[in-house]
UniProtKB/Swiss-Prot annotation:
This is Aquaporin TIP1-3. The chain crosses the membrane at residues 23-43, 56-76, 115-135, 144-164, 171-191, 220-240. CDD domains: MIP. InterPro entries: Aquaporin-like, Aquaporin_transptr, MIP, MIP_CS. Belongs to the MIP/aquaporin (TC 1.A.8) family. TIP (TC 1.A.8.10) subfamily.
Amino acid sequence: MPINRIAIGTPGEASRPDAIRAAFAEFFSMVIFVFAGQGSGMAYGKLTGDGPATPAGLVAASLSHAFALFVAVSVGANVSGGHVNPAVTFGAFIGGNITLLRAILYWIAQLLGAVVACLLLKVSTGGMETAAFSLSYGVTPWNAVVFEIVMTFGLVYTVYATAVDPKKGDIGIIAPLAIGLIVGANILVGGAFDGASMNPAVSFGPAVVSWIWTNHWVYWVGPFIGAAIAAIVYDTIFIGSNGHEPLPSNDF
């Protein structure tokens, strides 16, 4: 079970050069992701005069977040693992793939990156507000929690299958693309209901800059639960001592 591999970390680990570099990688990847993802929504709102939400707007949000996350994960992968998401980091911690001390360092970097990206957007757009995540009419907080659990489960399961699994073989090279695509697909599913965050930092940045915290807890509880379930399920079934055998590379 992954719970047996959970580690706090060693004294001084957070100050090691490799850990500091990894934190910077997470920070800059998050700035790239949030600036492009949140910024695309602001640009769409400006072009449409902040009119009502439309299917075209949802598709645009899906594509922009998918492309931006693909890039953000790719540029950080060789330094920090390209988590770009506190929930992904939590899933890696639950699976014993990162220590708690390094996870905390990642969380700080990710949250700061999201806030900086939103501040940059506010300044560069002449004071436009970054849109805080919110629930649509008729959607209760617990509806949204379930949405976030399921969507984040799919995301972190994809991360484990394409990036964490030591038996992933050649399919590992498509990890950033697969991660971006599952986020884009989930936005098409949940965007009209709760904004489809799957990422506490993505929700935190706009909340800080706009200072709107209504139901903000939803975007932490749901993703962290979904990430933990995905990590435990994938690690227990596929990475454990009696896990699967990798397919020959020519089968991909």
